[in-house]
């Protein structure tokens, strides 16, 4: 698929409707994605209203594409539907645990990626928001998510109003391990990251953030130990609140 080879995140959208017909078609096609036990352990909350998008925005650090996109999808790990079905059919469900969350989260993220591929093949632009798992309680409250439903991904969707350049990727050899895992030597790390570190765009990131290396942009500025630990606590609390962790 050329759309995969050429994909970029789209954060600016044209003032053009994404019809219910098109959206539902893409969502239905995405349901053919792999799923554990054919249970489809996911659900999707569609937000179109300005009010709804403004309510979600703070959970995503008020990134402008949340309110600027015609459609925002919140994809949830959902064991509630399966649990209620089982209870109503004389089953004894036991899905209030971390393994069940992982199974449902995997289903939800597979669905998210399949939908993204389909949407972009249809000409739409998307942006995956990793912020969904940073402050999940805000999303849970805003979307009124019940027990055994946990937000794991968000997509903003619309017709592109920008065409950004492709971002760099590590070389294929950096991710492939034949037969067994081969740990990373310093020489391999240097090799894998040489091209990324040599790019002028990334050199500029280092300069404007007033650090010595590109790695420090990520560890000291963007994804700090302090923030990761604090948000981990919040995520675990949300899992407990939603019934996946005791």
Regions found by a protein language model. Give the residues of each.
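Acidic, surface-exposed loops and disordered segments
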Residues: 1-246
């Amino acid at each position: 698929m050329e759309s995969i080879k050429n994909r970029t995140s789209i954060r600016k959208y044209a003032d053009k409707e994404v019809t219910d017909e098109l959206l539902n078609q893409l969502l239905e096609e995405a349901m053919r994605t792999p799923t554990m036990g054919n249970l489809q352990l996911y659900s999707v909350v569609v937000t179109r209203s300005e009010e709804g998008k403004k309510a979600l925005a703070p959970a995503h650090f008020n990134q402008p594409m949340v309110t600027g996109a015609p459609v925002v999808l919140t994809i949830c790990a959902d064991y509630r539907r399966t649990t209620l079905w089982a209870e109503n059919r004389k089953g004894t469900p036991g899905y209030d645990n971390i393994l069940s969350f992982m199974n449902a989260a995997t289903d939800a993220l597979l669905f998210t990626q399949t939908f993204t591929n389909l949407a972009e093949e249809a000409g739409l632009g998307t942006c995956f928001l990793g912020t969904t798992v940073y402050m999940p309680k805000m999303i849970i409250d805003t979307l009124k998510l019940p027990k055994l439903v946990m937000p794991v991904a968000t997509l903003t969707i619309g017709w592109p109003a920008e065409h950004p350049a492709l971002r760099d990727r590590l070389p294929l050899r950096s991710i492939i391990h034949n037969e067994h895992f081969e740990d990373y030597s310093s020489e391999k790390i240097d090799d894998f990251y040489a091209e990324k570190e040599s790019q002028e765009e990334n050199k500029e990131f280092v300069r404007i953030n007033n650090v010595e290396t590109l790695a420090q942009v990520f560890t000291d500025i963007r994804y700090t130990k302090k923030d990761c630990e604090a948000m981990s606590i919040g995520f675990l609390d949300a899992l407990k609140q939603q019934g996946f962790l005791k």
